[in-house]
Amino acid sequence: MEFKRCSGILMPISSLPGGYGIGSMGKPAHDFVDFLAKAGQTIWQILPVGPTGYADSPYQSCSAFAGNPYFIDLDLLAADGLLTKKDYAAINWGGDAAHVDYGTLYEKRFAVLRKAYANFLKKRPVPGYETPYPDDWYRFRFLSSDWLPDYCLYMAIKEANGMVDWQQWPRALRVREPEALAEFKAEHAGEIEFWAFLQYEFDRQWRALHAYAKEKGVAIMGDIPIYVAADSADAWAGRELFETDAEGKPRRVAGCPPDYFAADGQLW
């Protein structure tokens, strides 16, 4: 079998230059695709694009399927009428443009995204009614139905419990008692939908970026973590798929021994 030789550059989306604290899938990403094409490169290698948690690592994500809301481009949301420039342009996203301040992002980015969600609610379609915006909302929900509901519920519960590990949630929610979940869904329906909105917007921008890269002859080569994280929607919603104890904690873990980069070794 013959393979065509090709070359490219590794550039995490988070490392793209931008004015709002972290790289995004808008102009910064499209400009980088243009740079690759002009340089004769045909591959853009990225790191995993899943949501990051307290460790701020793309290899420790709370979902094997969801996208990182931090990568949603605010200017594109503004272009869609979901934000105005004054909603985010004057915010201090961190004092060092060369580094991502994840603490600041967590405190300020979601507040801006909630403004976008509030404006989205004024436009989103209502089942049974004719509306021009947006037809792909339901299509996305349908195509993501095997993971999105559990992820959104997980994030809403996590938010309501101070973002602690799901193994520290109230037992009824931790073990997914039907009555407890039904009660939580009824009381936090708006919060659950907020997390669905973020994934919808991520998906729209991600697909647009892929299409643009393909048009320019650039393939995006991704990466994924070796394991699903213990503190994830996947582990919480699919405990039967994992070897855990009665509390949901992994019975066995893996990693690698100490080396030059990690004196204490790594626990994956």
Task: Give the residues covered by each predicted segment.
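Alpha-amylase-like alpha-glycosidases and glucanotransferases acting on alpha-linked glucans and related
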Residues: 1-5, 12, 18, 55-203, ...
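Catalytic domains of carbohydrate-active enzymes, especially glycoside hydrolases
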Residues: 2, 27-52
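Hydrophobic faces of well-ordered beta-strands that scaffold small-molecule active sites
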Residues: 7-11, 42-45, 220-222
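Active-site mouth loops of central-metabolism enzymes
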Residues: 16-27
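Short alpha-helical segments and helix-capping/turn motifs at coil-helix boundaries
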Residues: 27-34, 139-140, 204-212
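Conserved, mostly hydrophobic/aromatic
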Residues: 36, 46, 154, 213, ...
